[in-house]
Every structure is written in C-alpha cells, then in structure tokens.
C-alpha cells in the first residue's frame, strides 16, 4: 500500500466539503460522483473520535474520577487511531462518492450527501462503527455520538458495499455497510428501538463540553 495519507486525506476532504456545500461534488479523475438508488452506504473509520479527544482535554478530571487508567488508555488509543488509506483508494471507481464526517457527526454527513443529490437514504444507527469507550464517555457527558465530530472517518457510497467494507477491513480500518441509497427523498433511520426520519443537522455535541 502507499504510505498513510490520513492527515492529507482529512485536509483534502475537509476542503472539498467546504467547497461544495449542498451541491453535487465535482472531483477528479472521474468527474461528478454518483449517488443512485440501490447503492450501499459504507462507513470507514469509527465515529466520535475528535469529540472523545476534546472530552479528554476539557474534562480530564471528570474522566479520571469516573474511569480507571486502563480504560482511559484504551479510549486514547481508539480516539487517536488514524484512518490509514492510500490516496488511490479514493480514485477507485468502486467508490462513487464520499463525505468526510466532521462537524455535526455522521448524521450531518448523511444529511449533506443525500441532500446534495436530492436522493433518499435508509440506514441503521446500530450498524455504524463506534467504540465502547467512546459510547461510555458520551453517556457520562450526555452526548449523542452520532452528532459528535469524528475526524478520521468517511462516509462512502458504492455499488458493492460489502466488498468495499471487506477491503477496508483488510487495510486495518473499521468498516461497515450501514444502509442504502433509496428512491424518493426520505431519509429513513432505524435503530435504538425505533424507526423514524433523519432530522436537519444539529449543533455539534462537542459544544456541550464547554
């Protein structure tokens, strides 16, 4: 594999995200991306990492009072784990579109990418990769991990999502197929004991940390 490009990847995708807003994404070398019914939604990386690091910085004493040092070491390791993918991976025709998971978390990324193409989606919260350590930190500070900035996490679209997820796992990345692109414009969400529709992006949960 080519050298890890996690930092360059984050910079590139962040720049791309800011440039396109809610419009279709223009990218090279394949031109405009593709986001059509029947395709799979794949998450590469674990959500909530940047938020967990912010908690470790801003709420260090509260974390040390609640959790054992071994737990905090695992949390730090999980939060700092880089998404190491070669640049060529994002130029592969098998990845027809992507959205970097940043402010507002995975739910904002799902809203943005579906809105850019005015296309419906369905997905399960329970299938989205998140570490147990990050979940416990979110519970302590009453944070929604799905609306927490992630960093090192990308939402991808593919015709063959299961194959894509397997390739990602072979590269050492957490990966899961979480849903599909659907006909219509509804954004259907399941998991956590209920079925509903995705709401507009909310302020990032990291703001609750002060």
Regions found by a protein language model. Name each.
Residues 171-210:
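Acidic, Ser/Thr/Pro-rich beta/coil linker or hinge segments at domain junctions
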Residues 75-149:
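Active-site-proximal betaalpha loop/short-helix elements
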Residues 53-75:
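Short, compositionally biased
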Residues 57-62, 111-118, 139-141, 166-174:
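Short, solvent-exposed amphipathic alpha-helical segments in soluble enzyme
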């Amino acid at each position: 594999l080519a050298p890890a490009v996690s930092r360059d990847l984050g910079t590139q995708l962040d720049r791309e995200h800011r440039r396109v807003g809610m419009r279709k994404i223009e990218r090279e070398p394949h031109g405009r991306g593709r986001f059509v019914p029947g395709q799979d939604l794949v998450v590469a990386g674990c959500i909530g990492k940047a938020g967990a690091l912010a908690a470790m910085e801003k709420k260090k004493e509260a974390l040390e009072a609640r959790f054992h040092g071994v737990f905090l070491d695992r949390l730090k390791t999980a939060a700092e784990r880089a998404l190491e993918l070669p640049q060529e991976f994002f130029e592969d025709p098998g990845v027809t579109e992507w959205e970097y998971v940043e402010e507002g978390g995975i739910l904002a990324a799902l809203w943005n990418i579906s809105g850019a193409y005015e296309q419906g989606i369905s997905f399960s919260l329970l299938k989205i990769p998140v570490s147990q350590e990050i979940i416990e930190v979110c519970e302590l500070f009453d944070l929604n991990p799905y609306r927490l900035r992630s960093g090192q996490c990308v939402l991808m679209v593919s015709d063959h999502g299961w194959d894509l997820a397997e390739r990602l796992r072979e590269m050492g990345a957490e990966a899961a197929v979480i849903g599909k692109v659907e006909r219509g414009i509804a954004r259907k969400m399941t998991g956590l004991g209920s079925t509903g529709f995705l709401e507009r992006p909310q302020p990032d949960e990291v703001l609750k940390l002060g």
